[in-house]
C-alpha cells in the first residue's frame, strides 16, 4: 500500500514538474513524441535528408543526434582542420580526444603537426580516408600516424614540400615491414603536386601498400626522357631506385608489378607523351583500367592515346582529357566506337573538336557525364545529333552536361536538349551570349525539374522575365517564335471576350510613340529601359492576388497562357550560379524565388540587386551556406544585417568590392553569423583595415580576406575544425568563377 502511494505521489510530482516547466517555458508539447521513435525508423527517415539537413536535425535532441551518427551517415562526413596547429594539449584536438564520436574521414589543410599525442592511437582503428594538403609534417610524424591506421583505405598527400625533401622517409626496413602489415588494405594512393618526390620514395610507398588499385601522380615532376633515365640508372638492371629523380620508366616498372590490381591511373598535369602511353600499352592484357585521367597533358597526341585505348575497350568507364589540345575528331570517334561502356567523358577545352566528332557520341549508350565546354567549334546541331539523334525516346542516362562557352549554341538547341534530357542533375550553360535566352530558361524550369546544379554564369540575356516567367506564356508555347503568338483581334470582339472572362485584363492596343529625337547615349537609353521594365514588373507583382486566390485563379484559367514558369519549380536545386547576369534585379528575388534546398548561390556582379531583393532571398532560401555577393554595388549595411540574421547556416560569405558597406556590417556579422567560416571583404573601402578585430566573437571563423584593395594577404582568426559532406573528386579544369572556399562545412 505504501509502495503504491509512493508511486502515485511520484507520478503527481512528475506531472506537476512538467506542468510547471511548460508554464515557465511557454512551450506546450502536442502530438506524438517523435524523439521516442525506434532508432531504425529514425535512421530510415534521415536517409531522405541531405547531409546538411541531417546535421541540423541532429541538434534537436540527444536521440536524433545518435541517429545522425549512424555508421551509414558517418561514411560521408569529413572532419576537416584548416590552418590550425595539431597539438593534443590545446583546442581543438584536446576537445576531440574526449569525444565519443568516430572520425572515418580526416582532411588536414595547412596544418602544422606539433604534438600528435595519442589521437591516432585512440581513433586510428576507425579512420578509412586521410588527406594531408600543404601541411607541415615530418617523416617521423607521418610514420607515427600511419602505424595506427589499420582500417585505412585511401591516403592523399598533396603539396607537402618538406616531407619529401627528406630522403630518409620509410628508410628503415623494420618500419616498412610494420607498415606493410598495417596498411595492407589501402587501395588508393594520391601523391599529387609533390615537387621532390623521387623513385625511391615512391617505391617505399608502394612497398608498404601491397593492395593498391588507384595511383595518382598528377602534378608531380616526372621525367619521361630516356636520356635522363640512363644518366641516373647507368646499369642495365637499374634495380636500386634513385633518390634524386622521378622517372616514368621506373614508374612503369611499378605499374607492371601491380598491373593485375591497378584500376585507376592519373598522370594529369605532367609531360606524358606517346612513348609513355605505348609503354603502358605493352602491359596488356593484364592491365585493365577503369578510369584514366590525362588532364592538361600538353605532349599528349592521338597516336599514343589511340594505342592505349585500343587495349582498354572492355573495362574503361571514365576518361578525363581536359585541355588535351591536340586531340581531334578522329580520336573522339575511336573513343565512341571502342569504349561502349564509357560513363564519364570530360574533354573540356579540346579546341580541335567539332560536330563531326560529337555526332559519334550516339554510340555511348551508357554515358552519364559529358563535358565539352570551351570547344568553340561544336554547335547545337552536333550535340543534338550525338545525344538524342538516334534514340527512340528521351535520353534518361545522361546526368551531367557541361556546354559552357559554346559560341554556336542556339537557343533552339538548348530547348531541344531540355526536352530530350529529362534526367539531368547538373546543367552548365555559362557564357552564353545569344538573345532570346529567356526562352531557354523557361524550358529549363519546365522540363528539368530534377536539377540540383544550374550554372548560368555570364549569360548576358538572363532577365527577370526568364527567371519569373511573367508574360512568358505565349513565347514558351511558340518556342520563341514571335510571329506565332501575336493574333489580330478586333476591338469589339476583345471587349466581348473580356465581359465573358472578367479575370483576364484588358490589353489596350499598342500605339506607336510620337516621333522624337533622343539625345541620350546608348548606355543611358539602356538604363532608362531597364528602369521602366523593372517598374512594370514591380507593379505586376504588387497587384497580384494572395497565394490562395492565385491558386484558385490558375485552376479556373490556364495561367501559363499568359505567364510561364518560375525558377521555384526546381525544388531540388542546391547550387545556382548567376555570376555577372547584369539584367537581374530585385524582381527575380521578390517574385516566387523559393528554393528550400539551395545551399550555394552566386550573385556576384549583379549590380541591380539591393536590400529589397536580399530581404526576400533570405526568407525564401533559408538553407544557403555559401553566398557570393561580390561587386553588388547597390548593397548596404541593411542587406548584410538581413543576411546575418536569417541565414543561420551561412558558412561562406563574399562581399568583395561592395563599396557601400561599413563597419556596421562587421558588427552585424559578429552578432548573428555564428556559423561563419570564411569572409571576404576585400575592396570594401569604408571598412577598417583589420576586420578581424571586430570578429573575435566568432570562434569558427578561420579565414578573413581583408584590405581596402584587392590584395592577397590572408588573416586567420580562431581555429578551423569542420565536419563536411564528402564530395566526389573532380579532375575538371579550373572554373572561371571566384575561387571556391576550402570546404563546405555542415556541422560543428
Please place each PLM-identified region on the residue numbering.
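CRL adaptor-proximal regions
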Residues: 1-36, 221, 490-537, 541-544, ...
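N-terminal adaptor-interaction module of cullin-RING ubiquitin ligase components
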Residues: 2-284, 288-296, 301, 305-309, ...
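Position-specific detector for the leucine-rich repeat
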Residues: 83, 112, 136, 161, ...
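Leucine-rich repeat
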Residues: 124, 149, 183, 209, ...
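Acidic, serine/threonine- and proline-enriched intrinsically disordered linkers and terminal tails
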Residues: 223-245, 469-569
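Tandem repeat domain/solenoid detector
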Residues: 275, 298, 302-303, 314-318, ...
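Eukaryotic tandem repeat interaction scaffolds
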Residues: 374-377, 381-391, 396-399, 403-413, ...
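C-terminal interaction modules of eukaryotic adaptor/scaffold proteins
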Residues: 649-745
